[in-house]
């Protein structure tokens, strides 16, 4: 394995560029042409991408994971070129000062601090206007894309209002019932959460179809659909992680490109929020395999947004995280190494393998089927640890045992199964990208997007 010290100079250079950006309030320049596009052209479209749980340790580990071992340098990821700063994430909660996804998303959608669990409402329970609603008021097309349920905390905080993120059925109702200028306020909805739309008390899928929306539930139908308004639900709950996904379930890149293609038909432009939801879920699970799988899914969607913006020349792209998750560390137990090869050996997530074993599959056969033995040759002790966990027949016990193998072999550390409160990176490209530079607060994401939309609003951010 190549040692990191041989390859750190380019990363240091990138970091120094980013640091100078923070100090000066400027954005790293890819070229004079891109600078012209970023600073002089009017904004027609805004794309906000949120890597849920994606702290700096995740973006750093992903860089090392994707590194080309044949070179002497650590190659940058798609994110690195457009790093402009970092943001604080704390909520305005009477009992907690580490944010959840709802409070953080509300900060980024509405520009206000609020309590954990709040969906675009303030501490008094009053609804706060979101940037998606502002875009719709300006006549733009709007969309939400996520790998979680589309009613989960982050997308919900852009497209609905509720005192609790747990009310996912009510959030689904809001997506249909709440109008802006007499129109449904979200034109494209792509993600999971079918169970929140197809219920005994209400069938929102039928209602959306009656209102003129297309409905799709697999990748093939989504890609061939020609309509500008579409509801796409590809799982009852969240989508499988990228590494576990079958061909009939779209990737985050697929959904992002589909949303952009449909929304871009609107002559007045569009607003789109895209969430890589399950970076966070993997972090909660202390699952490094799942985390890196979801980082790749998110990077590909991010690249799709950037590629569109470069061609369009009137699109602002902002990418960030709502918080970090798991207290993830690159290196653990006092060992000064971190190895990506064990992670690359996985063909499926520990969750996937654990469910197979809990259903009665042979432990050793399952592990060796879904873990490349050339990259990670399992020891007898490692196999026995999973066999011991399997005696309980509990998926969680088996999952933890398999995750422990990957964590130990890669020297990955975790401190919690919850969120952590550090600042998170901010990336931006296109017109007004410089407004996101430096040390900012997460509420400034929304405030700057409102400005980009030329929407005048007085935000009560007491």
UniProtKB/Swiss-Prot annotation:
Q: Where does Mg(2+) bind?
A: 52, 154, 275
So where's the catalytic machinery, residue-wise? Answer: 101
| InterPro entries found in the cross-reference section | Alkaline_phosphatase (IPR001952), Alkaline_phosphatase_AS (IPR018299), Alkaline_phosphatase_core_sf (IPR017850)
Binding positions for Zn(2+) 2? 52, 322-323
- What start and end residues bound the annotated signal peptide? 1-32
Self-association and partners: Monomer.
**Binding site residues for Zn(2+) 1:** 280, 284, 419
Which Pfam families does the record associate with it? Alk_phosphatase
Q: Which organism is it from?
A: Bacillus subtilis (strain 168)
Quote the EC number. Answer: 3.1.3.1
* Annotated gene: phoB
Family listed: Belongs to the alkaline phosphatase family.
Which co-factor is required?
A: Mg(2+); Zn(2+)
The answer on whether this UniProt entry bears the keyword Hydrolase reads: yes
Its catalytic activity?
Answer: a phosphate monoester + H2O = an alcohol + phosphate
Molecular-function annotations in GO: alkaline phosphatase activity; metal ion binding
Q: Which UniProt keywords apply?
A: Hydrolase, Magnesium, Metal-binding, Phosphoprotein, Signal, Zinc
Q: What's the protein called, per UniProt? A: Alkaline phosphatase 3
Q: How is the cofactor bound?
A: Binds 1 Mg(2+) ion. Binds 2 Zn(2+) ions.
